[in-house]
Amino acid sequence: MSDNLVQTYSIYIKAPAQRVWEAITQSEHTSRWGYGGDVEFDPRPGGVFNNLSTPEMKQMGMGDVAIEGKVIEIDPPHRLVLSWKASWYPDSEPTRVTWELTEFPSGLTRVVLTHDVTAAPQLAAEIAGGGDPQQGGGGWSWSLSGLKTLLETGVSMEESAA
């Protein structure tokens, strides 16, 4: 999977689509799943969607913004398409991340995340995961697991492991 330039991940979360949307787009939630960090989000096409660096990321030499992005398409709480540029590859081109949320009458929401790294193929192995998640190697599988854990239990994976 590490050579796949268009990677798709699908999970089901026992939460309404609106709650999932808020967890993806609001700092009070984004700081508690994945690799943490607040977001700057201007919810309109062309608006910013930046994942800010945590203090730990800054200690490793990262600047204030870990992931720089722009909103390409937005249809709350169903679809969000973003440009996505990793700050640790300053010479790479932006990639594209698509979030698709489908709510079912049962109370489940299917989350489909597609990351097209064709413009920055060196990211393929990193976003596929397989490394130590505590060192940033868990990729989207780690991040989505954290999102699901937070929404279904109310605590982050780090909090529940403590």
Q: Locations of the language-model features?
A:
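Hydrophobic pocket/interface hotspot
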Residues: 20-21, 30, 49, 71, ...
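Hydrophobic ligand-binding cavity/cleft-lining segments
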Residues: 1-40, 44, 162
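Short, highly charged C-terminal tails/helix-capping segments
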Residues: 149-162
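Beta-strand/loop substructures that line and gate deep hydrophobic ligand-binding cavities in soluble
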Residues: 87-141
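Intrinsic-disorder/low-complexity, polar/charged segments enriched in Ser/Thr/Lys/Arg/Asp/Glu/Gln
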Residues: 4-10, 17, 48, 66, ...
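A short, structured loop/turn motif at beta-sheet edges
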Residues: 17-18, 42-44, 72-78, 100-110
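Glycine-rich portal/gate segments that line the openings of hydrophobic small-molecule binding cavities
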Residues: 41-85
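Hydrophobic/aromatic beta-strand elements that line small-molecule binding cavities or substrate pockets
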Residues: 11, 67-72, 95-103
